Amino acid sequence: WRAIGVTVIICALVFGGVTYYYNHGWIPSSEDVNMTCEKVGDVVTLSFYNKDKNVTMTAYLDYSTKDGSEQITLNARHANPFKKSMRQGAYYGYTFIDDSIVYNEDGSKRKLTDEDILVIKYKDKDVKIKIKDLADGKL
């Protein structure tokens, strides 16, 4: 019985370790992430890819910052070889009506000012971008 108990404990530890490794996320450092900006028609998309191809990225948007800015927090995690990931990177986009008006997520229109800032949170720093500056699809 002792051998069975030890085997069960070892299997549980290995399973727990593998599960933690592939499900535990972290905020990546800025030097680990490639960020691109692309404009297709009126839609500007920011794309975030980890330089390590075995790491997938997700992005979470937070409107509730104290200064009223929009904040993207990136999250990285190891790619699980047992699950097919639909995408490697994280994406966030704006639909511009013109250079100073965008559609909000609820479909309403919003006039942009110089105070409308997008903050991208990395482990080592925050990058601030004026949303108006994204209208041409360049960073």
Spell out what each predicted region is.
Residues 27-139:
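Polar, acidic low-complexity tracts enriched in Ser/Thr/Gln/Glu with frequent Gly/Pro and Thr-Pro motifs
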